[in-house]
Swiss-Prot record:
May have a role in host tissue attachment, whereby ligands may include the serum protein fibronectin and small sugars. It is found in: Secreted. This is MPT51 antigen. Its main location: secreted. Residues 1-38 form the signal peptide. Keywords: Acyltransferase, Secreted, Signal, Transferase. GO terms for cellular component: extracellular region. The gene is mpt51.
């Protein structure tokens, strides 16, 4: 019985160590190379006669045909 308890305790210590190591790696801040900002977009209100209201449409800047 004491062998089973010893193995169980060893397994628990191993699992806690692996969890601590994983959390340490996951919580490290990523290297920041520059200021991040969202891509520019243009927002238009397009009238829809069928729906009886204006529909907001957003176009992203850039792309292969820009």
């Amino acid at each position: 019985m004491t062998v089973v308890r010893g193995v169980s305790a060893l397994l628990r210590v191993f699992c806690i160590a692996m969890l601590a190591a994983g959390l340490g790696v996951a919580l490290q801040p990523a290297a920041v190379t520059g200021a991040a900002r969202a891509a520019g977009y243009e927002s238009l209100m397009v009238p829809s006669a069928a729906m009886g209201r204006d529909i907001p449409v957003a176009f992203l800047a850039g792309g292969p045909h820009a």
